[in-house]
Amino acid sequence: MAKIAKQLTDLIGNTPLLELNKYSATKHLDTPIIAKVEYFNPGGSVKDRIALAMITDAEQRGILKPGATIIEPTSGNTGVGLALVSAVRGYHLILTMPETMSVERRNLVKAYGARVELTSGKDGMTGAIRRAEELKREIPGSVILQQFENPANPQTHYLTTGKEIWEQTEGKIDIFVAGVGTGGTVSGIGRRLKEYNPNVKVVAVEPASSAVLNGKPSGPHKIQGIGAGFVPKTYDASVIDEVLDIDNDDAIRTGRELAANEGLLTGISSGAAVYAATLLAQRPENRGKRIVTLLPDTGERYLSTVLYAFDEYPL
């Protein structure tokens, strides 16, 4: 039987797992860290999953009409996913994002036909959310899908990503590690894995300089895609066993090591997740345990950032 997708959205999900053998060897780990490589999604990130899920959910509930305008505050990857799905399904899209987001991300969504409105970097995602709400009041029939509150966000990870990880590992997983932006990824996957095996440990990752999940003040950081500066409604603390706070430089250094050692060109948040997984693997009590982490996106949209600014930001 021919395997031909009818539309691009049919290719979202079912991303591969990869053993980080060379990286793990350089860190002298007993067991290689395993990575779910989400840049194999057609839009280049894990956020393709929630973009498709939120739009489909809004269609099914009748709140998103044909040809309507979708508005979304986003730090980048969700915007790319929404732009891709909107192009396929015929929606107008306006994205609000902090001006600190990379130029590649802005231009990428524009290429799909989206309109971008930049907000003050010092206001973080809070400013982007505020501007999105203003636009919704101005544009009749528009819809904000609101990834930070939408239950379809964690639910799609429960239904797809978590199930994929369990099946790909044949149930042999002890610890799952993921960064927290909206919290939907770690919450949905964590809930599914704990249903399969309550002993699976779920670890969330956030920037050390904006460690709100650990009760510390929000602040600026360099790890794009995680650390929104507030605790999202889509974050389910009940499935989280531990939250690790990761420094900017450790995330950046690890991201560079993944490219140099594994040929994995990923984003800064992938570096944070793998560094957190490394810290866990180095604990004596975790010796020999299988640790799976998730690499949210491709590094191609970070080439203008500190991640690959080797001369200007040496480590």
Q: What does each of the following model-derived ranges do?
A:
Residues 1-315:
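PLP-dependent amino-acid enzyme catalytic core
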